[in-house]
């Protein structure tokens, strides 16, 4: 806008020297008996160029500058003034175009360059890759942990087997303890058994002395067995077979067991 006002002021000075100036405010006024040059209108938001007849419908607030040339009877002066006005208008147009080009250049400078756009797209792609990398790292860690677990699986199995053996050993010891307790109970019961065997031995001697006729009449088989047991330390049982003569009874030391079928009529 500053350049426009500057060009207008320059134009007015030049036209003042050439032909004179008339300034009109508001609407259009009167008719002139002089030859008129093109008009320039300055509105609120517009800049117009044309003849007076073409611009009669402009708003009343507009201000236009009319340049005219007085007829002094010399066409050369009029032609010179028209040439000057056309040159000034072209210079004014060039100034406007230069200002527009400057504004466009500023806007272009404000816009991001292609390299910046490419870098931004690369940054976005790198950001997406970085976001996807933690998931990939997790999967790689899982694979490594699985391989490590598989490699340590066999030692763990062997160690588990050893632990199972260690757990079984106390149970075996307990079982052996139960067996030893049973053996100890049997050993403790041995004196009672010995006492019973001694009582049976005394009864058998009494019966043998009480029934002499049974001894005389009895005929033993050619071969018969008398099983006897002797109580020794360690609960060891000895069995002995023999062939006694007629009327004889073998009674070993420590006890005797006579079977009824050994003595028959």
UniProtKB/Swiss-Prot annotation:
Name of the protein in question: Seminal vesicle secretory protein 3A
Major location (coarse): secreted
Domain of life from the UniProt record: Eukaryota
Disulphide connectivity of cysteines: none
Start and end residues of each stretch annotated as 5 X 4 AA tandem repeats of Q-X-K-[ST]: 116-145
Coiled-coil zones: none
Tissues with expression: Highly expressed in the seminal vesicle where it is detected in luminal epithelium of the mucosa folds, and also in luminal fluid (at protein level). Not detected in other tissues tested.
Record key words, sorted: Copulatory plug, Glycoprotein, Repeat, Secreted, Signal
Role noted for this protein: Component of the copulatory plug.
Subcellular location field: Secreted
Sequence repeats: 116-119, 122-125, 129-132, 136-139, 142-145
Cellular component, GO, one term: extracellular region
Organism: Mus musculus (Mouse)
Signal sequence coordinates: 1-20
Reported modifications of this chain: Glycosylated.
GO biological process: mating plug formation
Family annotation (PANTHER family): SEMENOGELIN/SEMINAL VESICLE SECRETORY PROTEIN (PTHR10547), SEMINAL VESICLE SECRETORY PROTEIN 3A-RELATED (PTHR10547:SF7)
Gene: Svs3a
Induction profile: Up-regulated in response to androgens.
